[in-house]
Structure formats: structure tokens, C-alpha cells
A protein has these predicted regions:
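Short basic helix-loop element that most often maps to the first helix and adjoining turn
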Residues: 4-23
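Helix-turn-helix DNA-binding elements, focusing on the entry/boundary residues of the two helices
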Residues: 17, 28, 46
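Short, basic-rich loop-to-helix N-cap that marks the start of a DNA-contacting helix
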Residues: 38-48, 67
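DNA major-groove recognition helix of helix-turn-helix/homeodomain DNA-binding modules
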Residues: 44-59
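Short, charged recognition helix plus adjacent turn
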Residues: 51, 61-70
Length: 70
């Protein structure tokens, strides 16, 4: 499962879901689904989010350790 820090970093930068969505060209609902882990974004969206949140993609998104699943 893909984990992320989008909500945390979005808030740190003072962006609403709508603000971030507008910056990267998606809907507010898309940001909500990504934050809840219900949608895995494309690499293009990952790169856009990382750019606007001033963080590397691997610090923003990571795969949940498979050992935690067992």
C-alpha cells in the first residue's frame, strides 16, 4: 500500500485541498482521495505535488513495509 505525507505537508505550507489541487491541476476530491490512501497518484502528480510541497517524492510517498502486513 502506498503511504503519504500529503495532508501533513499541505497543512504545513498553509494550502487547503483546493489550493493544492489548483496548483497541480486536479480536483479537491482527488487530493482528498490521495491523502486517505484511496487513490495512488500517477508519477506526474507525485512530481507536481513534491515540487509544490518542496520535498522529494520519496519523502512524500513510500510503500508500506510488507512485513507490517503479516
Amino acid at each position: 500500500m502506498l503511504k503519504n505525507r500529503v495532508k501533513e505537508l499541505r497543512a504545513r505550507h498553509g494550502y487547503s485541498q483546493t489550493d493544492l489541487a489548483t496548483l497541480i491541476g486536479v480536483t479537491r476530491q482527488t487530493i482528498g482521495f490521495i491523502e486517505k490512501g484511496e487513490l495512488s497518484p500517477s508519477i506526474t502528480l507525485c512530481l507536481r505535488m513534491a515540487k509544490h510541497l518542496q520535498i522529494s517524492v520519496d519523502e512524500l510517498f513510500w510503500l508500506e513495509d510488507e512485513e507490517e502486513l503479516t
